[in-house]
Amino acid sequence: MTNISPIEALGDPTRRQLFERIRRGSCSVTELVAIVPVSQPAVSQHLKVLRQAKLVRVEKQGKQRIYHLNPVGLAELRRYAESLWEDVLQAFGEKAESMANEMEESHIDDE
């Protein structure tokens, strides 16, 4: 199986749409085919990528394949988002400190 990151997998609009539907609740391939403007084989390929990224898992129930969210890929996605947020907060803190220093220097120059 090819290794693909959750971020890469969600880079495709059709996969994002499928993922969002599964996020709202487990569903069958038939239900997923009904929500996107692509063929059933194309949906199956998109679902394969989501499985490879560990964002979804599949369970066979009789003749149907039911897709569920996979906590493994979601945890990786969360770690990535948290690292981005930490970078944003650090940059914000640095900018705020820089602006405070500029204001202080400006205030000293005005005296």
Model-derived features: where do they sit?
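Helix-turn-helix
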Residues: 40-41, 65
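C-terminal regulatory/oligomerization modules of transcriptional regulators
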Residues: 1-2, 9, 21-35, 40, ...
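Base-recognition residues in the alpha-helical recognition helix of bacterial helix-turn-helix
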Residues: 20, 44-48
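Beta-hairpin "wing" of winged helix-turn-helix
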Residues: 51-62, 68-69
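Basic, alpha-helical helix-turn-helix
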Residues: 15, 62-63
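Short alpha-helical elements of helix-turn-helix
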Residues: 4, 10-16
